[in-house]
Structures are given as C-alpha cells and as structure tokens.
Design a protein with these regions (language model features):
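Short, well-formed alpha-helical segments that are part of the catalytic scaffolds
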Residues: 13-29, 52
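Cell-envelope/extracellular polymer assembly enzymes that use nucleotide-activated donors
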Residues: 3-5, 37
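Aromatic-flanked redox-active Cys/Sec active sites in thiol-based oxidoreductases
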Residues: 10-12, 43
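A generic structural motif
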Residues: 31-36, 61-62
Length: 73
C-alpha cells in the first residue's frame, strides 16, 4: 500500500488545526488504496497549539506531533 505524508507547519493554530486534520481524514476516506500520516509541526507557537496537537495525536493514530524548541519560520 502506498503512503501519503502531510507535513503541516503550525503557528497560532490551536483553533484551526483540528479542522485541517478532519478535512484530510475525510479526503483520505475516499482514497482507500492509500495509507497516510499527518505530521503536525508546532513552530514554537505562543498559544496552545501543541496542546491541541497532543489531543489530536491521542485521538488519531494517523497523526504525529513535533514540537520545535524555537521558531524556525
């Protein structure tokens, strides 16, 4: 099975990243021939973006979270 990886930089995204993951999951349900992962990269966001990412990781085994120690732009 082929795999698609979505790598999404996140900055001040605590209120929007969940919707993005939900849209990707809905799209991938229409493509059963592919496995997928969503890699959410918190770019040292000052809000609770990484808290939201942690919740998404706990709820969906397709989601991986990365927390950067400083903003890389």
């Amino acid at each position: 099975m082929q795999k698609i990886s979505y790598v999404i930089p996140c900055y001040r995204s605590q209120h929007t990243v969940g919707g993005v993951v939900a849209e990707i999951a809905a799209t991938m349900q229409t493509l059963p021939q592919y496995d997928y992962e969503v890699i959410l990269v918190n770019d040292c966001s000052p809000d609770d973006t990484f808290g939201t990412i942690r919740s998404l990781v706990a709820a969906d085994n397709h989601v991986v979270g990365v927390d950067l120690a400083k903003n890389f732009g």
